[in-house]
Amino acid sequence: VAEAVHSPARFRVESIRHDGVTDPAEVLDIDVIHDLAIIRSAPLRGVERSGHESQATYLSLGHSDFSKGTRIFSMGNPFDLGMSIVEGIYNGLMEDSLYKKILFSGSINPGMSGGPALNKAGEVIGINVSTAGNEVSFLVPVEHLAQLHARVPAAPDPLGMSGTRWKKRIGEQLTENQDQYVKRLLDPAWNALVVGEAKVPGELLNVFKCW
């Protein structure tokens, strides 16, 4: 998706169905801060080989507010080995983090990024985004996906038609995020620490770590 956004004249997006059939798709909107995109696939082609009209199946969006220790399930295609389901533990939101992500105690591997994380009811509660190894993985809360989806009209004009429009969209999101970030940093009074005869700034924000 990133390549199609940065160079829409060189790359295209396709969706692959469970039976291996590919359909053209288009990027409708993105959330560059949370590494999300809304993609629309072309309508399923006519009639399946059985002669019955195609019926698409979709996942439902849930919420990311659970008790720590809840079992959840991450889906993806690790190392292009085939669709896999990884069971793990929900360990809440990372509060002392610049971006609120879900801490997932489970093994997310390359190829699983962008896949859904589900609760026992099969509802999407997050999106695979990254891993630190040793079963320390991170999910984007599904609420960010719901917000992005709500911004897309029923019949959108795809921004991907122009690389220039995409760059403008990305720039707007980055600027807005940086403005909020700097405001958080500068608004509160800084705590001072006494070191000998000097006073130095203490913790600016709890999202900054020294390790």
Predicted feature locations:
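Catalytic-histidine neighborhood of serine endopeptidases
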Residues: V1-H34, S41-L44
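Short, surface-exposed secondary-structure boundary micro-motifs
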Residues: A4, N77, V129-S130
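Extracytoplasmic
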Residues: S7-R10, G20-T22, V32-L36, S67-G69, ...
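C-terminal cap/linker of serine protease catalytic domains
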Residues: A25, V47, I127-V195
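Active-site substrate-binding loop(s) of clan PA
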Residues: E26-L28, L44-P78
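Active-site region of chymotrypsin-like
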Residues: A42-Y58, L81-P156
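Secretory pathway targeting signatures of secreted, lumenal, and periplasmic proteins
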Residues: N206-W211
